[in-house]
Regions:
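Transmembrane alpha-helical segments that form core, pore/gating elements
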Residues: 14, 29, 123-183
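Loop-to-transmembrane-helix transition segments
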Residues: 33, 38-62, 131-140, 185-203
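Cytoplasmic-side transmembrane-helix entry/capping segments in multi-pass membrane proteins
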Residues: 43-55, 98-111, 130-134, 155-168, ...
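Specific alpha-helical transmembrane segments that line the substrate/conduction pathway
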Residues: 16-23, 65-95, 217-236
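C-terminal-most transmembrane helix of multi-pass membrane proteins
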Residues: 226-264
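Juxtamembrane C-cap of transmembrane helices in multi-pass membrane transport proteins
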Residues: 1-12, 17, 61-72, 78, ...
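Hydrophobic transmembrane alpha-helices of multi-pass small-molecule transport proteins
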Residues: 101-120, 246-262
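Helix-helix packing/entry segments at the starts of transmembrane helices
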Residues: 76-81, 154-170, 205-236, 263-264
């Protein structure tokens, strides 16, 4: 998804990309909600998941904007302060246990992120655009962590279909006016990409909600670091972004951290 968004970002404004991602996601979300016959949400469900929709919009727009300014692997690497924040917030807010294996895994993943950032961003020259992009990523990581904690809180209380419905329909409605303000008419080929993007978003969010309903946030958080491996690969294949030794060293730490949690 991130690679597709980065490819679309030179041609379309951030608000439009985010809107179309959620707009196409609405189709799958509504269909899933109707198929499961989950019923109408309660007032409590509406309140919490409405807040999640707002957090989702802030996360998406800030990270999509960052992708237009930073190499793919760098943007993903910076965003991976989020798993550490998620695990810590899970312990502080939800009372989840933070044992030594998870702490070591988080530390390994965070050190891996620092290696990649220091190696790639440092060598490229940290200019104004990169600084703005990095700030946008860090903001998105903070908001995303709050969103994940709220998802963990609601995933055991609300029907999965309602969670998916709010995340897509709510975010789409919030983004409608900003997207129209900066609208650039998409080509047919790009509309197909947006449709794929929306579908992938719904599938990914469904799997994420399903996982957080069954596993503590702290244990799942380090697994997200594996995404960085794909970011490096797609950055190389589609954007000619060649990773350096620091990237591979950081990726190795990330993988080690992920396997530690699985041996818990």
């Amino acid at each position: 998804m991130d690679a597709m968004i980065k490819a679309l970002s030179p041609r379309y404004p951030t608000f439009e990309i985010a809107f179309l991602r959620f707009a196409f996601g609405m189709v799958g979300a509504v269909a899933y909600w109707m198929w499961t016959r989950s019923g109408w949400p309660t007032r409590e469900t509406t309140l919490y998941n409405g807040l999640r929709a707002v957090l989702g919009v802030l996360t998406a727009t800030s990270f999509f904007f960052a992708l237009s300014l930073l190499p793919l692997a760098d943007a993903i690497a910076l965003s991976f302060i989020s798993p550490a924040l998620t695990a810590l917030m899970g312990a502080m807010i939800l009372g989840e246990r933070l044992d030594w294996r998870i702490a070591v895994a988080l530390a390994a993943g965070f050190l891996g992120m620092l290696l990649i950032v220091g190696g790639k961003l440092g060598s490229a020259g940290f200019g104004t655009e990169a600084l703005i992009g990095a700030a946008a990523v860090l903001f998105s990581a903070l908001v995303y962590s709050l969103n994940i904690i709220l998802l963990r809180h609601r995933a055991t209380r609300d029907p999965l279909a309602q969670i998916i419905l709010f995340q897509n329909v709510g975010a789409g409605l919030i983004l409608l006016l900003p997207a129209l303000w900066v609208w650039v008419t998409p080509t047919l080929a790009d509309l197909v990409q947006f449709a794929i993007l929306g579908t992938l978003g719904v599938v990914a969010h469904t799997m994420l909600a399903h996982a957080f309903a069954r596993v503590e946030a702290a244990k799942l958080a380090p697994i997200a670091y594996v995404t960085l491996i794909w970011g490096v690969l797609f950055g190389f294949l589609f954007f000619a972004e060649v990773p350096g030794l620091a990237t591979f060293a950081g990726a190795a730490l990330i993988v080690v951290g992920t396997f530690i949690t699985q041996r818990r």
